[in-house]
């Protein structure tokens, strides 16, 4: 017992003894005041540890117990730089980050001595190559025209674009660099729900304005949608499309609040909210409450914007809710110009752990469900579909194209391009590279012209890599890639093509008297265009 007690207080006792020793020795050698001061400081810290009530470990282990907090503080850096395996995705592996960094710097991305991947591991994926490869197409031709029959200003989008990230979440310099890179590379920059800031406008890069439930940039004083203010911004030539945000993969079904102390004059002006007051983003929209009302809201936005493409972004949660939206399309004949499917693996900032880990459908399942539902209702050829969620490489792009996407967006990929090192401190305002902070000194470290070049090169080199992959597979255009080109290892001894793994509906299948798929038949019965709620109650299994 005495031995245990002494070991717990060893550092504290030694600090007292050494303080006394150095004080005595100061009588002969005055310079001993330095170690006396240091040991005295430790002694005072030990006394504080013994008397404080917040940390039990410090009360039991004064002074030395604080090493736990120090090691806990530096653990992420130690893990990332010394312990993490090259292919360990938490959330992005070193191999993935290095790929982005090299492409952003326009450096050679070739790697010698073969793959580091275990090609016999279950889940390994690849694209089948052709014995008759074709010449690689011009990557700049990989563009998609977005805009349906009711759209008067269709937009030609790149196959690879910057996903939604708001000013406020990202620094002013990060926004500048992203938009300047997008302008040079002729691809679009999604504003995120934080509205269009002056930094988005400086370099005139194409913008997709994301409209969240807070209606930032076009809201009334009580937080509702303001048609007049919306029209003023949406009709700007720089704004190419309007995207209604229903949910996002990082925290689906969750609203948000920006504390009053963070709502400075610049954020307030950008979002159209009072300065110094809590900025609330509700979990759901007030402009519509049913799928039918949502379709009419889409039509209203299209008219107010001057006929620009209008669509929505969502992470699939309850499947019947999306089916209800599609039924509302059929009922009203009002169609969105596009739909962006966000996977639950997405997320550029902080989110409640339970929501980021356990809410929402992963991208591939959500994307295929959206694609199948539109195909089954005969609407797929009238609505373009985008995808976002942990997409950074040409292979990532190809793997979602075969599941129904027409184009893709990337957020964290472009964050890496402007300097993000995955410190995972986005929510602390202490981002070490100036990407995700509003600290004026920290964001000064991000040099806009330099990082804009990296954004441009990352996009350019990634799309070029996609063109090379397609050519090796024997196709020249992204839309020619099918589920028969992509393979996945199912067991250590079996590989299947996507066409044999995933279920694809036939055109018009959901409009037939009898729906062959039991799952889609059940979702169809559960959905109604008049409500997001279930139309029927199913018996318990």
Label every model-predicted segment.
Residues 280-443:
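Glycine-rich phosphate/ribose-binding loops and adjacent secondary-structure elements
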Residues 219-246, 362, 367, 372, ...:
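Phosphate/diphosphate-binding loops
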Residues 186-187, 239, 307, 336, ...:
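A structural motif
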Residues 392-397, 401-507, 511-528:
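Gly/Ser/Thr/Ala-enriched C-terminal appendages of enzymes
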């Amino acid at each position: 017992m005495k031995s245990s007690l002494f070991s717990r207080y060893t550092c504290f006792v030694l600090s007292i003894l050494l303080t006394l020793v150095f004080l005595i020795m100061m009588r002969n050698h005055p310079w001993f005041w330095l170690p006396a001061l240091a040991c005295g400081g430790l002694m005072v810290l030990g006394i504080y540890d013994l008397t404080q009530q917040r940390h039990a470990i410090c009360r039991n282990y004064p002074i030395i117990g604080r090493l736990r907090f120090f090691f806990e503080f530096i653990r992420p850096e130690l893990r990332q730089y010394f312990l993490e395996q090259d292919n360990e995705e938490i959330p992005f592996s070193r191999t993935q980050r290095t790929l982005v960094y090299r492409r952003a710097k326009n450096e050679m991305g070739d790697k010698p001595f073969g793959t580091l991947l275990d090609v016999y591991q279950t889940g390994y994926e690849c694209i089948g190559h052709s014995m008759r490869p074709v010449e690689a197409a011009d990557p700049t031709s990989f563009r998609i025209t977005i805009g349906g029959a009711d759209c008067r200003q269709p937009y030609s989008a790149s196959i690879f674009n910057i996903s939604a990230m708001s000013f406020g979440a990202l620094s002013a310099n990060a926004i500048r660099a992203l938009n300047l890179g997008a302008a040079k590379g002729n691809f679009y920059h999604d504003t995120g729900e934080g509205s269009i800031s002056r930094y988005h406008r400086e370099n005139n890069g194409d913008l997709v304005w994301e409209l969240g439930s807070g209606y930032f940039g076009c809201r009334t004083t009580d937080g509702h949608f303001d048609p007049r203010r919306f029209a003023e911004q949406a009709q700007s030539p720089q704004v190419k499309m309007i995207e209604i945000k229903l949910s996002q993969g990082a925290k689906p079904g969750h609203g948000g609040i920006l504390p009053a102390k963070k709502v400075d004059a610049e954020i307030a002006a950008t979002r159209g909210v009072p300065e110094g007051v809590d900025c609330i983003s509700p979990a759901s929209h007030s402009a519509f409450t049913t799928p039918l009302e949502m379709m009419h809201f889409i039509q209203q936005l299209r008219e107010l914007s001057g006929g620009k493409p209008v669509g929505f972004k969502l992470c699939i949660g309850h499947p019947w809710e999306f089916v209800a939206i599609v039924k509302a399309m059929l009922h009203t004949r009002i169609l969105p110009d596009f739909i962006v499917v966000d996977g639950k693996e997405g997320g550029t900032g902080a989110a409640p752990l339970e929501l980021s880990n356990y809410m929402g459908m992963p991208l591939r399942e959500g994307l295929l469900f959206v694609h199948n539902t539109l195909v089954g209702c005969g609407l797929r050829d009238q609505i373009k579909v985008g995808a976002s969620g942990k997409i950074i490489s040409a292979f990532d792009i190809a793997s979602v194209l075969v599941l129904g996407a027409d184009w893709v967006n990337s957020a964290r990929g472009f964050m890496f391009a402007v300097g993000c090192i995955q410190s995972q401190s986005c929510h602390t305002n202490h981002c070490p590279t100036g990407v995700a902070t509003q600290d004026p000194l920290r964001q000064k470290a991000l040099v806009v012209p330099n990082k804009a070049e990296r954004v441009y090169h990352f996009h350019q080199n990634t799309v070029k890599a996609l063109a090379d992959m397609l050519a090796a597979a024997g196709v020249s255009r992204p839309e020619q890639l099918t589920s028969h080109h992509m393979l996945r290892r199912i067991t250590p001894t079996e590989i299947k093509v996507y066409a044999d793994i995933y279920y694809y509906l036939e055109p018009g299948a959901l409009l037939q008297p009898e729906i062959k798929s039991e799952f889609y038949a059940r979702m169809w019965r559960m959905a109604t265009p008049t409500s997001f709620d279930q139309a029927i109650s199913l018996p318990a299994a």
